[in-house]
């Protein structure tokens, strides 16, 4: 069958070879010559650097003030324990962006990721991963802060943002959020009828178990598609985009904080920080609010309880906020 010289071939043969639950090879063919490397390299970079995931970013170990300590009855020193915590694969099923988990174990025993007490919407994917070894007198108690993120985040960048509020003994970890542990691609020759100058793309992908390899490929392709969409219609109607964004925002977030019926003290503290709408409030963290003059723990707990009653919480992330309508209102005010 003869094809137009301007018509590009699209992959029609897709094979997935599962090596194990976390490791797969995905084969796509045929591509026009050169497109195997073009798309393979783009997907590989996205898979390694831009996939969202969860990681332990902070540990508070009972009796430990800094990472250069040793714990009586524990075979590993604190630095080794922190390195082991970095490899704990955590999956959060809910909408929360962070969670604090607890671990408590007495010796003699091996402390594994499965010993971490989790909430109903949190899953430890590698429960057999070893964290520490305890002898007869050993005991290990700690709290772990797990957050959702993307890419790689060094501990020193996070520490500089929270130095004033971070208590002594809260040990910071470099965080690798990407669930993709290893990815490579290769391009081989493919053939369609009489054409032998085509590409076959083979992607070899391994994850930490929190994300299926096939789903990782789909998400990376979606990210690439969304980024390229801007080039498809460079004259897109921006006003229409703004309207669509506002339609997706929960109406409760557009309501003023006065509707929360907080005490006068709490309400005045929020307004002093230019927090006028519920959408403004939920994006603030507890640490940020506690820095507000005259706003103490009691007011903070009141705010958290009122938000929880409406299915909201502090530290949430909102895209496209504030919407254009609120920007106009604030400008006119």
Curated annotation (Swiss-Prot):
GO terms for cellular component: cytoplasm; DNA-directed RNA polymerase complex. Residues 249-333 are annotated as: Alpha C-terminal domain (alpha-CTD). Gene3D superfamilies: 5' to 3' exonuclease, C-terminal subdomain (1.10.150.20), DNA-directed RNA polymerase, insert domain (2.170.120.12), RNA polymerase, RBP11-like subunit (3.30.1360.10). One of its GO terms (molecular function) is DNA-directed RNA polymerase activity. SUPFAM superfamilies: C-terminal domain of RNA polymerase alpha subunit (SSF47789), Insert subdomain of RNA polymerase alpha subunit (SSF56553), RBP11-like subunits of RNA polymerase (SSF55257). The N-terminal domain is essential for RNAP assembly and basal transcription, whereas the C-terminal domain is involved in interaction with transcriptional regulators and with upstream promoter elements. Belongs to the RNA polymerase alpha chain family. NCBIfam families: PRK05182.1-2 (NF003513), PRK05182.2-5 (NF003519), rpoA (TIGR02027). Homodimer. The RNAP catalytic core consists of 2 alpha, 1 beta, 1 beta' and 1 omega subunit. When a sigma factor is associated with the core the holoenzyme is formed, which can initiate transcription. This is DNA-directed RNA polymerase subunit alpha. It comes from Chromohalobacter salexigens (strain ATCC BAA-138 / DSM 3043 / CIP 106854 / NCIMB 13768 / 1H11). The gene is rpoA.
